[in-house]
Amino acid sequence: RVCPRILMECKKDSDCLAECVCLEHGYCG
């Protein structure tokens, strides 16, 4: 999957860019 390497806080997958998902530590990855 395509996920820009930008540190972004999130609560759910839709908070993240491209195909990133929200990981357990609260950041996109």
Swiss-Prot record:
Which chain positions carry the site (Reactive bond)?
5-6
| Gene Ontology cellular-component annotations | extracellular region
Query: Which Cys-Cys disulfides exist here?
Result: 3-20, 10-22, 16-28
Among PROSITE patterns, the record links this protein to:
SQUASH_INHIBITOR
Q: Which SUPFAM superfamilies match?
A: Plant inhibitors of proteinases and amylases (SSF57027)
Pfam families assigned to the protein according to its UniProt record, in alphabetical order: Squash
Localization per record: Secreted
Q: Which UniProt keywords apply?
A: Disulfide bond, Knottin, Protease inhibitor, Secreted, Serine protease inhibitor
Question: SMART domains annotated for this entry?
Answer: PTI
InterPro entries in the record, alphabetically? Prot_inh_squash, Proteinase_amylase_inhib_sf
Gene Ontology molecular function terms on file = serine-type endopeptidase inhibitor activity
Q: What is known of its domains?
A: The presence of a 'disulfide through disulfide knot' structurally defines this protein as a knottin.
Q: What does this protein do?
A: Inhibits trypsin.
Family membership noted in the UniProt record? Belongs to the protease inhibitor I7 (squash-type serine protease inhibitor) family.
Protein name (record): Trypsin inhibitor 1
